[in-house]
Amino acid sequence: MAAKAGDNPDSLMTLATVFCLRNLRKTMCYQGFRNKLCLRSDIFLPSEICDKLVNIYMDLVLTDSNFEPEESFFQLFSDPRSTRLTRVQLREDFVRDRDLEAIRKQDLIELHLTYCNSLSSRSLKTLTCFRETLVSLCLFGCSHIFYRKGGAPLACNEDSEDEDEESPASRQALETDFSFQGFNRLRLLNLGGLPDEVDAETLLKPLKSLTSLDLSNVQLLGTAFLTQWKDRLASLVLYNVDLSEELVSTVVELVNLRHLDISRETRRASKFKMTRKILTAIVQRLVNLVSLDISGHIMLDNCTVPHFEEAMGRPSIEPCKSSIYPFQDLKRPLQFLGLYDTTLCNVTHIPAYKVTGSKNEDQVLNAIEAYTEFRPELAHRAINQLFDIARIQHCSQLLRALQLVIAALKCHKYDKSIQVTGSAALFYLTNTEYRSDQSVRLRREVIQVVLNGMEQYQEVTVQRNCCLTLCNFSIPEELEFQYSRVNQLLLKILEPARQDESIQRIAVHLCNALVCQVDNHHKEAVGKMGFVKTMLNLIQKKLQDRMCDQVMEFSWSALWNITDETPDNCQMFLNCRGMSLFLECLQEFPDKQELHRNMLGLLGNVAEVKALRPQLLTPQFITVFSNLLDSKADGIEVSYNACGVLSHIMFDGPEAWMMEEPRRDTVMEKMWDAIQSWDVSSRRNINYRSFEPILRLLPQSISPVSQHWATWALFNLVVCCWCGVTDCCLPRSCIIHYPTSELCPCT
């Protein structure tokens, strides 16, 4: 049997690492002084394990809301005699100055800090601790690291754990003392988003051996300084850097470049125009190029071969057949060519193995893959194009598409535009058309990122997209591994008194499905979250608006499901004015048959609880139930459910009947008449989880009419395997099999 998309299991190393991180005190750590987490003295962890621990820890912190961060986690790696760190990747505001200071004694080779806006210039001081070993450094999006906190001087304080972390907004004093002097082994440097106040040329001057430099979104005052690496630099990224003829002239002198990125975001104003002459110069002078990105540039003159002159046949990557004139000078096809947001991506023959653009699915997926980490503004647009492909056409690379969207949503949990487009794309990529090709593990990943989005954003579009995506899953089965979390999020959506109507409808539908066909433990847990009160609040609001819509009906249906054989939830229903709302709904919506059925089904659950039945035994309620026995609404459903409520009440005997009117005998007579009027072969819209509440009414003589109702119910519900008198929606385990036709009571 072929494996489904995304079915590759995690490695044993990954599984063990995650387990240890979730159970630190039971595995490698103990609780020390002042509850500080300490590494056990008999443990030594090599770099392969330490790197994995830190990097997976960051992933769990950012993507798993059930994971509890440890305040002193990074202190576990403070002593290189017991732990060895070499390659660390940290991101987002979660990372603080004290975390870097904790690992300052480690011989780091690679340190990637991305969007770490809680870091101040204290961390620049810490960086100098790694200067003798660091080979690769990324400070992308860490603009606050170049500012002091409130103008305080640089410090690398042993007691920094107790120092109050100030907000980034308070950082105003630019740090001028930091220098890359002594970082002699540094080869790869990413300074994307460097503040305009920092002079890149001065900062970079001490670094003589760089082979890779990223200056995305950096304002360059001059360009000549780049030539100091002309014999070494293999990769240069100048995304969203203001290009000029001077800068291009400098770039083409860097003859050893293998990767050049001079792309831009099209919505960013630029005076520079890409010409055929400039593109030709880049190709002819930089003969070692294997990767080039010119995305977002408007071509000033025509760079493409006229259609009637294009080489015949299928699309080719051979440079000699290139539909783009300058690329005909290439010695070999490029490994990567960025043409996103340019007209060049639409030509027939492009001499590159991997192309970003918007022409087809492959180009769009390449764009998402290339731009997700550092260019969410481009990834957002590419995901939007993938959304159109999945919605209108057909996604042929399903696994890759899902994995890329999931990665984008994880990477940019706090980017609203990514969350909106990503959740919309997931809705179409997980629908029925693609479902059979997806593994359990892949679909669980989708659920996780969808719930992350719901948790982070209360914005209408994100919430709607996430709720709609959840509707593509089998409920409750596929959501059970996140059962508590998804219920909490849905109830939070339904809390506001005024809410988007479509979100309300979807969220209530999901709530209803989640409490249907689950065990009592789950129902009780959800009840304690405020499920019953939330549904009743929705009903109250609809009553005020005098509107009986799907939200109203789904809310009563959800209450019917959550109170099934759960006395605590039934008690909550009564405590929260449930009976008053029942009477108001009956009066306000006398012709809503589905509504009546759901309400009476719920009250049947309440009536099954002996301790609660006295609260139903009032003249007003008994009169209402008795009158509903005559109802022909929804077939026999309303009459049947009303009779069920009364059957349980009658089961308590005449001594419990303390009222004079209506008389017990009169009500019992009406019950007999109602049962006799029902067609025993009626198809019922009901699904009992067990027969126990019905069977409880049989072995007694206090209330024969209750026995009669229970007997009729069982006979109507079972499937006779001989004559097929009735049908039902019960599991096959509830079908009664008779050994011979002579024993069948239907014959």
Regions found by a protein language model. Give the residues of each.
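N-terminal "cap/leader" segments of large eukaryotic alpha-helical scaffolds
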Residues: 2-9, 13-27, 330-331, 337-402
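A structural signal for leucine-rich repeat
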Residues: 101-106, 124-131, 148-183, 201-209, ...
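Alpha-helical solenoid repeats of the armadillo/HEAT superfamily
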Residues: 135, 181-187, 204-211, 227-234, ...
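HEAT/HEAT-like alpha-solenoid repeats
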Residues: 365-373, 403-414, 448-458, 488-499, ...
